[in-house]
C-alpha cells in the first residue's frame, strides 16, 4: 500500500511538472490538489509536502489565479469605460463577463484555501513551511478581497491580515531577515496594507523595515538564497520608491499641486 501511494505521488508530481512546461496551470493545480488529497497519510502527522511539492503547488495556483486576476482588471477597466460613455448594453455585457471571471477566481481561491486550512497547515511541523502556508493563505484571501463586494471584501481582508500576521510572527521568531520566504511575506503583506487596507504609511514602514533588516544581515545570506533574496529586496525597494512618491504627490495635491500617478499593479 505504501509503495502504491509513493508511485501515485510520483505520478502526480510528474504530471504537475509536465503541465508546468506546457503552461497548463489549471491542470498543474489539479495534479497537486490530487496529491494533497490522496497521498498525504492522515495517520502520519509528519507526512507533509516536500519543498519541491510545496513549490509546485504554489506555482500552479499562483499562475492559475494570476491569469484570471489580469483578465479581471482588463474587463473591469472596459466596463468602467463603457459606463463613462453611457454605453449601457456594452457595460452590461462586460459586467456579465467580469462575473464569470470572478466565479472562476472564487473557486480556485477557495480550493487552495481549503487545502491549506484542512490538510497542509495542520500537518506542518517546521516553521519554514508554516510561514510559507500562512503567507499563501494571506495571499489568496487578499485576492478574494480584490473582487468582492464591501461585506465580502472586509471578511476576506480580515482573514488575510490574520494569516499574514501569523506568518510574520513565526518568520520573525525562526527565520533570518534575508530568508526569501520572510522577504516575500513582507513584500506581499506591505502590498496588502497599501492596496487593500489603503494604509500607505504603514505599507512603507513595513517594506522599509524588511529591507533595512535584510541589509543589516546581508553578509550572512546563504549562497542558495542569494539570488531570490536580492530579487525580492529589489521589489521592496521599487515599491518603496513608488509609494513614497505617491505619498508626496498626495500631499502636494492637498496643497493644490498636481494629481499623483496611479499605483502600479503588483
Swiss-Prot record:
Ranges of Polar residues composition bias in the record: 158-168
Gene3D superfamilies (alphabetical): 14-3-3 domain
Pfam entry (one): 14-3-3
Start and end residues of each stretch annotated as Disordered: 154-177
Top-level division of the source organism's lineage: Eukaryota
Family: Belongs to the 14-3-3 family.
Name the record gives this protein: 14-3-3 protein homolog
Phylogenetic lineage: Eukaryota, Sar, Alveolata, Apicomplexa, Conoidasida
